[in-house]
């Protein structure tokens, strides 16, 4: 994790699917399809065009992570390139999605967390809902969280507009 005294080495920003889908697809293909073995037909579910998306960029402009918020308040497809994990990128992406959810009027968000990263989501205020289940061949747990306290843009966000689709 980056100490508070060090400047962030990345930014996170909302993006339009139509303008950035090749970049979003490349990140997700690398993390989910190649690294985790998710079948491509499950990864590309047809919901991206109407979702809110964010991308994390290294300061040199390299895309390093992404996530999305669906119109039903479901957060998903949170992916960080392996070399950037453990440096606050995933946390910043999630925080950005929570602020977007709050600003769009969602009181509560939900997600399906891979069981190996449950603690990451617990630290961000998510609560487990129900038993483990398999999704795309990976063990998951449903989780929910209020967005009421998520009103300030994360430090990694350089602007103020929210993009969708």
Regions found by a protein language model. Give the residues of each.
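Conserved beta-strand in the GNAT
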Residues: 55, 61-79
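Conserved active-site alpha-helix within GNAT-family acetyltransferase domains
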Residues: 115-141
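Conserved N-terminal entry element of GNAT/NAT acetyltransferase domains
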Residues: 1-18, 150-165
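Conserved acetyl-CoA pyrophosphate-binding loop and the N-cap/start of the following alpha-helix
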Residues: 84, 88-96
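Conserved GNAT acetyl-CoA-binding A-motif
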Residues: 101-114
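Active-site rim helix/loop that mediates acceptor-substrate recognition in acyltransferases
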Residues: 29-59
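Short beta-strand micro-motifs in enzyme catalytic cores
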Residues: 50-54, 76, 139-143
